[in-house]
Amino acid sequence: MKNCKHTLLLITFLLLSFWNGNAQALATNPKNEFRAVWIATVVNIDWPKMSTDNVAKQKADYIEILETYKKLNYNAVIVQIRSVGDAFYPTELAPWSRFLTGKEGQAPKPYFDTLAWMIAETHARGFEFHAWMNPYRATMDYNTSLLSPQHDFFKHPDWMIKYGGKYYYNPALPEVQNHLTAIVEEVVEKYDIDAIHFDDYFYPYRIKGELFDDTASYKKYGNGLSIEDWRRSNVNNFVRCVSLSIKNIKPWVQFGISPFGVWRNKSVDPRGSETEAGQTNYDDLFADPLAWMENKWIDYLVPQLYWSMDHPKASYSKLLRWWSENSTNTAIYIGNGTYKINTDSDKRWNNPNEIPNQIDITRSYKNIQGNAFFSAKSFLNRNQNVTKLLTENQYKYAALPTVVPGSIKKMAIVPTANNILIDPIASRFNVTYPLYSKVRYVMVYGAKFNSKIDINDPSQIIDKIAFKDDNNTVEVVIPSYKLDKNTTCAITFIDFYGNESEATLVNFTL
């Protein structure tokens, strides 16, 4: 190995936006765009594949998901860590999930902190980790014999409401709201997550002929409101409390919610969308995403637009426009239903261009900054004709997630490359973690000549390397085959909010 310390030029400088005639290319392939996939654990939808799988297989399968989506140039995973009053991590507030260990309340054997391990593996591959929780759903059915004695169904039976084949936490009870908030607080305090994520399950979807019996709570706490407004106020209060708690503990941790795709139909509210949805957020789930945005309680919203582009009752294209026009104070990403590809009664989903077309039209709205896809197994060794289209077009290049809303700032620090070495196999150098800062990643960019370096061009992204808590130095290794076209590289820092520093140029000139 040859030490090139005296022949390599190292320059730290401000890289201005250098478009170089690539404006159209950068618009087509944005540098910052949220690209996420949901990893559902409930009833083993995505992972673990079976609750009886051994730990080694579970780890291998999780890594396979990460590696698959890294190759597809995704940058975030939304992992379900609480689905039915259970947990994928050690806690006194809920039992271990049976979907992880085969028996509720039983820890993994051999023991490991599943959540901590998942976060480390996720960050090591450059992904954000969004911890997905279902706050109100307590069980999947009425078979309570499967529950641990430590489940809230047994510890607090007065918190439960029986409805539609499941048990739910009563959203009206202050003690329930406090308990669920404490669960969120514990995860934020203990784990290096990037976000807390709730999905569309607030009050349950209506079932004809069934009553969600919160009558006693309404009589006690209704305070003169209609039952509909009272239910919405219960959800709003919970969302507000969770938001305040997260930001009080770690202000860089995001709070995101993925609601049902229709706020209200225009037929009942002139502000609503041109849809004929059988149920809506506002009227049936008693969830009001517009209020959450207006009050700045959430960092991002991911409306679930699980319909085809021209669905007659809920058109993806019409709903996309509606959410863009009604967004405020909040990042908006769109939830896409990849699970419907080649499996839905709507035959539009048989067209391999449906998802690519949805991404294209999403990018045409400046108020929308990316997409999330349900769910992970959709592109895991299946639907390869769709993934081929994505990797050749929409997701040809890597992208960074968007900056946490309201947290855009200029980073005062810049990275420094040390111990620069090159050999026929690779070029290497070290980057040290800066003192008194919150830096998560080192970004590496490459171009053939110094004048061509443009950190706004996603085609120049070579790597994204995570700092580990126990290691304040990372080694950057650039294989020689990448340097054939990228003889010069630039490095930047990414902080915990997603802000990027100015760049340091590393010129491999012999």
What role is predicted for each listed range?
Residues Y395-S437, E500-L510:
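Pro/Thr/Ser/Gly-rich low-complexity, intrinsically disordered linker/stalk tracts
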Residues F286-P312, T328-S407:
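Substrate-binding cleft of secreted/luminal carbohydrate-active enzymes
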Residues A87-G102, R137-Y163, D200-G222, S267-G278:
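Aromatic- and acidic-residue-enriched segments that line the glycan-binding/catalytic groove
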Residues P479-E500:
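Beta-strand-rich modules
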Residues L72-K109:
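Aromatic-lined carbohydrate-binding/catalytic grooves of carbohydrate-active enzymes
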Residues E175, H179-I183, E189-F198, F202-T275, ...:
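Active-site neighborhood of glycoside hydrolase catalytic domains
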Residues A60-D86, K190-D194:
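Catalytic domains of carbohydrate-active enzymes, especially glycoside hydrolases
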Residues A40-A60, A131, Y136-K190, D283-A287:
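Active-site-adjacent "subsite" loops/lids of carbohydrate-active enzymes
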